[in-house]
């Protein structure tokens, strides 16, 4: 039994060391507090020097407003701050720090020296604390306007805490992550980082979008920016802007996710759910999206004082914020088209972007052997003299929709087609070439090879057609249900009694999905109607898979919540299969539909549907021009 002990008031030192357990976990915690103080002081330049991963030394110098001599003793006192004076200030706090605990907690577990000046004549003052009972002495110390805080020998007086520190490399990695997060929060501030005497980063300040993108590329890597889409959405007092990576740039870990609320880096469950929901339709299972996003809203509508390290926040209207983030990202991802990706690719290669003609309306045959140079609905090939000498082919413009209707393309994929021999592209102005170019050939019955203005396009035809079918089915379902087509001869399938019961229980849902099923026995179903868009699918297996999904999700409410998963299952059955030989017109029609379809860069499972191998990249493979 624990003996009864008297209640005693803790000493200032012990109280601060206990508080340090929440505030100071490792060197990265110290750097976070010091940098936030500098940013709150109005600094436009931060110089950070680290030794031994921050365990031996952390020094931060800024050019902010500095601290008055008379305020220096208070700077290291607990619950002393210049950022809030009363409760009303806390409800709309705009600074990163406000509790007045950081320096007191740090100085209780490390050797801390603070030098500051508020004047331009380099007349500064220094205060030192080394884990003592808050006894500090002030002495003159030359220093330009601003503040330098030096922290040495972290946890030197608390061995139990020190033994929990990891290796120098691990601690430095955590520290570097903190610097990166803060560098992304303030593009208008220059950051310079040195470790063990070696310059690591030197990020210049800049406010233009080009300078911001340069900072993001430096912090997150150029590959992120190559695959990122800039978004900016506003609704009332809410504004969301930043960069989101395309789903094909997903990550195995959630290590490239930066979200800021009024400039404060946070990790919030509500935000994470909204982002995850926006990506769920295009992200491969087990993968994580990458993004750098900034949410701006009225400070009085968000509470930042709910977590010791201020990583979590609480919104006054959770549902409004969640739906705004979700709808903004969902809309942005849906609007990404192949020409957007190709334009960024060209920019990264230092090229102009000719040929990026969204929804080009002048498709043309690429090969000889199609009815004397033409196919249904398209004018015969003619040759017009070019201004550069020689000849170039000319074509009659026809809309993609007309071509699709008149040549009965891949919607009738099982129809017979005459073989077509592909040959080289005629030389035509690049502005006539649509984003995904024109088909050249089919590889192994799986991939479509096409040429566009920049190089070679490779398309996974099943994945691409699956996405197109899926998006059409979602649109039809949202407008009242899928159109149905009766079977000339109803098809009978044997099912379990549970599956037959499910078909009867959810008959209305099946009808909305375009099916008509009739129970013909305890374990028998008749398929009388199928969705028109899936008229070439294998009816029996399609119905079995939909039944399986409905049984898995159970109630009608859950089924409606997971309806996209069911539609994705159906779309997979209705899409062109591997080893199906397509004609050149069919391939071109598929490319045009990809250009006009939302989220066509990924299949329903999040895998990419196409990629570009630029001419420069091909030249490098063959070492041309080297």
Curated annotation (Swiss-Prot):
BP GO annotations: mismatch repair
Keyword flag Transport: no
Taxon lineage: Bacteria, Pseudomonadati, Pseudomonadota, Gammaproteobacteria, Cellvibrionales
HAMAP family referenced in this protein's UniProt entry, alphabetically: DNA_mis_repair
SUPFAM superfamilies on file: ATPase domain of HSP90 chaperone/DNA topoisomerase II/histidine kinase, DNA mismatch repair protein MutL, Ribosomal protein S5 domain 2-like
Identification of the protein by name: DNA mismatch repair protein MutL
Stored SMART domains: DNA_mis_repair, MutL_C
Molecular function, one GO term: ATP binding
Signal peptide: none
Pfam families xrefs: DNA_mis_repair (PF01119), HATPase_c_3 (PF13589), MutL_C (PF08676)
One CC-aspect GO term: mismatch repair complex
InterPro entries (UniProt xref): DNA_mismatch_repair_CS (IPR014762), DNA_mismatch_repair_MutL (IPR020667), DNA_mismatch_S5_2-like (IPR013507), HATPase_C_sf (IPR036890), MutL/Mlh/PMS (IPR002099), MutL/Mlh/Pms-like (IPR038973), MutL_C (IPR014790), MutL_C_dimsub (IPR042120)
């Amino acid at each position: 039994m624990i003996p009864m002990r008297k209640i005693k008031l803790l000493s200032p030192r012990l109280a601060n060391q206990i508080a340090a357990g929440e505030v100071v976990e490792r060197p990265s915690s110290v750097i976070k507090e010091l940098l936030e103080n500098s940013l709150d002081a109005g600094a436009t330049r931060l110089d950070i020097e680290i030794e031994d991963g921050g365990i031996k030394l952390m020094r931060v110098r800024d050019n902010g407003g500095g601290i008055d001599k008379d305020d220096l003793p208070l700077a290291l006192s607990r619950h002393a701050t210049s950022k809030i004076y009363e409760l009303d200030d806390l409800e709309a706090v705009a600074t990163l720090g406000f509790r007045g605990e950081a320096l007191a907690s740090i100085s209780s577990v490390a050797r801390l020296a603070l030098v500051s000046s508020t004047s331009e004549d380099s007349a500064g003052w220094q205060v030192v604390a080394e884990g003592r009972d808050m006894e500090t002495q002030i002495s003159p110390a030359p220093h330009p306007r601003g503040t330098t805080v030096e922290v040495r020998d972290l946890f030197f007086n608390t061995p139990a805490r020190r033994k929990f520190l990891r290796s120098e490399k691990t601690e430095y990695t955590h520290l570097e992550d903190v610097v990166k997060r803060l560098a992304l929060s303030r593009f208008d501030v220059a950051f310079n980082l040195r470790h063990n005497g070696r310059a690591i980063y030197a990020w210049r300040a800049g406010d233009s979008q080009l300078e911001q993108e340069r900072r993001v590329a430096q912090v997150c890597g150029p590959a992120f920016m190559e695959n990122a889409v800039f978004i900016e959405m506003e609704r009332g007092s809410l504004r969301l802007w930043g960069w989101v990576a395309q789903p094909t740039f997903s990550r195995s870990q959630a290590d490239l996710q930066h979200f800021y609320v009024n400039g404060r880096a946070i990790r919030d469950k509500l935000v994470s759910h909204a982002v995850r929901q926006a990506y769920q339709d295009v992200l491969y299972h087990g993968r994580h999206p990458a993004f750098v996003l900034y949410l701006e809203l009225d400070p009085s509508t968000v509470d930042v004082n709910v977590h010791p390290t201020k990583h979590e926040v609480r919104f006054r209207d959770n549902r409004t914020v969640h739906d705004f983030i979700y709808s903004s990202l969902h809309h942005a991802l849906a609007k990404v088209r192949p020409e957007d990706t190709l334009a960024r690719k060209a920019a990264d290669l230092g090229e102009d972007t000719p040929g990026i003609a969204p929804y080009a309306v002048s498709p043309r045959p690429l090969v000889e052997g199609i009815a004397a140079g033409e196919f249904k609905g398209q004018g015969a090939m003619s040759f017009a003299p070019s201004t550069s000498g020689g000849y170039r082919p000319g074509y009659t413009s026809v809309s993609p929709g007309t071509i699709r209707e008149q040549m009965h393309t891949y919607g009738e994929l099982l129809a017979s087609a005459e073989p077509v021999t592909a040959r080289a592209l005629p030389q035509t102005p690049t502005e006539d070439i649509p984003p995904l170019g024109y088909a050249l050939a089919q590889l192994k019955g799986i991939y479509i090879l096409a040429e566009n203005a920049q190089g070679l396009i490779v398309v996974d035809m099943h994945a691409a057609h699956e996405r197109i079918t899926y998006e059409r089915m979602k649109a039809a379902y949202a407008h009242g249900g899928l159109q149905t087509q009766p079977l000339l001869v109803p098809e009978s399938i044997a099912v379990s009694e549970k599956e037959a019961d499910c078909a009867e229980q959810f008959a209305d849902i099946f009808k909305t999905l375009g099916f008509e099923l009739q129970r013909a026995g305890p374990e028998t179903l008749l398929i009388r109607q199928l969705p028109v868009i899936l008229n070439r699918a294998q009816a029996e297996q399609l119905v079995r898979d939909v039944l399986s999904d409905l049984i898995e999700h159970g109630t009608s409410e859950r089924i409606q919540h997971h309806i996209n998963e069911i539609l994705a299952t159906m779309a997979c059955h209705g899409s062109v299969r591997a080893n199906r030989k397509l004609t050149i017109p069919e391939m071109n029609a598929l490319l045009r539909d990809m250009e006009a379809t939302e989220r066509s860069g990924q299949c329903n499972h999040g895998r990419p549907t196409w990629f570009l191998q630029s001419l420069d990249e091909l030249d490098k493979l063959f070492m041309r021009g080297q």
